Amino acid sequence: MCNIISQDDLIVYPDAGGYNHCMATFRVIHACCVLILLALLPHVARADDVTFRNHVMPILAKAGCNSGACHGNMNGKGGFKLSLRGESPALDLETISRSQLGRRVNLTDAVDSLLLRKATASIAHEGGKRFAVGSLEYQTLHDWIAAGAPDDNTALAKLTSLEVSPRESILIEPIASVQLRAMATFSDGTKRDVTSYVVFDLSNLLATVSAQGLVERVKPGEVTVTVRFNHLQQPARIAFVPARPNFKWSEPAAANFIDEHVHTKLKKLRMNPSPLADDSTFIRRAFLDVIGVLPTPDEARAFVADSRIDKRDRLINALLERPEFNDHWALKWSDLLRNEERVLDAKGVRAFHGWIRDSIATNKPVSQFVHDLITARGSTYDNPAANFYRANRSADVRAEATAQLFLGTRMQCAKCHNHPYDRWTQNDYYSFAAFFAPIDYKIIENNPRDENDKMMFIGEQLVVMNSKNQVKHPDGGRVMKPAFLGDAKQPAESKGDSLESLAQWMTSGENKRFAAAQINRIWFHLMSKGIVDPIDDFRDTNPPSNGPLLDALTRAFIKSNYDLRAMVKLICTSRTYQRASQPTADNEEDQSNFSHAFVRRLTAEQMLDAMSGALDAPVAFNGVPRGYRAAQIPGVAAIYRDRDPAPGDRFLRLFGKPPRLVACECERSNDTALGQVFELTSGETINDLLTHDDNRIAQMLREKKNDDQIIDELYWAALSRAPSETERGAAKSLLANVKDRRTGIEDIAWGLLNAKEFVLRR
């Protein structure tokens, strides 16, 4: 028999009775679903039942007619324009049945309607055949036209909610399909099965989905199906799990609730986690993730030799107190807050970076940090937090940046039309932007080097409030009042400070979205992938890979009073964080459930600081004091706007340091490119480090260290481990056969800096 555990958490797998019985049972269930749907077709197609908004509009969406690639395009197609994804039914009704003398519908002979003949490809149609004659789609449109293509009665019940079942499914091989069902609820309380009317979209190619909602596996993995009916959409998450007949849960130990939630899901997926990483891998990973630099050879040796069972917890505690922690996390926020010299100028960049770093050094709660940014005004020199508004110079840009950075919400689409993949409307967009309309600037001084660049400022500015500034809706020009995003509770009508009310609402413990977005960002920086991915794209149709884990982390973050260090410690002391990156046979396909560590390339700053640290030689940058590490550079001017950048500046740009023009993690690139290969193999930066007259190589030669000592030191400095016997033998052989000993040592160091193990965080 088949075991089905509730409708919202469906797990289907064959028991001891075998595959045939299970498949037979599943086919019966599927057949029954199809028969039920077919039985409904005559009912929903009756002319007296067909409505424009609840029947015709969904058909147009399902056929793709109002998509952005078709007639929902800004300019329409073939002279026929519909509102994008049906956001304006009244306009679409006019276009279909009234405009151009009603040429698209034939009220006396519905079969001859252009709307039907084009869609069935009875006549030429650039979009091809969208449905067949006699199909549900055809019959629905036919009956509506035959009834006179009427508008809906004003008393028509409105769509209020959409439910999809099952919401989550785990299908164990050989079970390879699941039938989704969509149920709509209307304002009069009626419910209707709309499975045949909804649009099904897949998040990836691991499965296929039919027009009737049958999801079938292509390969193992997890897929999200977005189910859309009119303006509402809901996700269904499905996992296709290999049979793994010999699977046995390994009962891994849990250090905290993170492990418990991760293990709960892994067990359902029949996936054992990888073992813990060895000590050398762990210390290198922890140093890079928590403070952005490599451990020194002495630090790495001491940690590996330490026999205390709590040494990993001790290490994390020590790293949290180091000054490099402040530099590392200030760098991340400087990227997101657009701390760059073109708009802020060099003095403003230094002030803003200093304020960010000081906030982290004093362990200011993240909620207070964001509150200070949202409410900031005055001189951008004297009150550096005001540079948030100096960088974002219009109400719409401020609203988009605030929503994306602090609420994990991408609002940009709703500027021009209702968001196609989220619940946000144009009203939501411009109501939220209205909070930021009063912000204005008093420019005390401006001496730009390029007077034609209207976004270049050099000189002091004041961020001030001007109550006369307004945001108007593009459709009709009505003045918008400030409104919180997705919250029935709205700011009180008053002459008070709207930004203060926004900051209080946003950072309140009741606003779980803020806390979830921030802890997801912290998780991403430590785990290399967000629980919600992309990390700033929270929406119902992009669900978290582990919802209970994200909820638990959100609660813990709020309970800690938004303590960054407490959350870093919580994550890094979990066994989930400490797992090896090498997958097992069970989890080699896993890309979202944290069964093993994810490998990624070091960031530009990490790479350059690691090279500098491994060779104990400084890198030169323009515009900062000698001895600065890459992670300590406040801005980006020398990297992106200096006519003669230093080698270190060019290196950072080549390896993906962002220009800080947008408020998004996505601006930083960790992609590989051919130019990076050339830079690492023969670039000016690596050559300067290798040949520096007082680097680690020169120091060891002065101290007359023997070959074994030199080889050991280089390996510990670059890879945080001792060389294997094979590696030691190869290095000693090289040194024995070179004329110049320093050149040979440089070759060994060059090889280590170009090794995958060096350039990757494992």
Give a label for each model feature.
Residues 2, 22, 32-33:
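Cysteine-centered motifs
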Residues 3-4, 13, 19:
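Short, positively charged and aromatic/hydrophobic N-terminal segments
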Residues 30-42:
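Bacterial N-terminal signal peptides
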Residues 47-139, 155-183, 191-255, 280, ...:
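Solvent-exposed helix-loop boundary motif
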Residues 51-67, 151, 157, 319-326, ...:
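Short sequence/structural segments immediately N-terminal
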Residues 61-84, 143, 147-156, 410-426, ...:
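Periplasmic/extracellular electron-transfer cofactor-ligation site
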Residues 250-324, 332-623, 666-667, 687-745, ...:
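Primarily short, surface-exposed interaction patches in extracytoplasmic proteins
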Residues 615-641, 645-674, 678-679:
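Long, His/Glu/Asp-enriched segments that create or flank divalent metal/ion-associated functional microenvironments
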